[in-house]
C-alpha cells in the first residue's frame, strides 16, 4: 500500500488528475454558461 501511495503522489499522476479535473470543470462551465467570452462586455 505504501508503494501505491508513492505512485499516486508522483508528478505525472498528479498532473494528469489535475488537468482532467480542470478540463471537466471547464466543460461543465461551458455547458451551463455557453459563450462566456461575451460576459465582460455586458
From Swiss-Prot:
Disulphides: none
Transmembrane residue ranges: 7-27
A Pfam short name: PSI_PsaJ
InterPro entries on file: PSI_PsaJ, PSI_PsaJ_sf
GO biological process, any: photosynthesis
Membrane topology: Single-pass membrane protein
Compartments where found: Plastid membrane
CC annotations in GO: photosystem I; plastid membrane; thylakoid membrane
Alphabetical keyword list: Membrane, Photosynthesis, Photosystem I, Plastid, Transmembrane, Transmembrane helix
Biological function: May help in the organization of the PsaE and PsaF subunits.
Family: Belongs to the PsaJ family.
Cross-referenced PANTHER family: PHOTOSYSTEM I REACTION CENTER SUBUNIT IX (PTHR36082:SF2), PTHR36082
Protein name: Photosystem I reaction center subunit IX
Protein's gene: psaJ
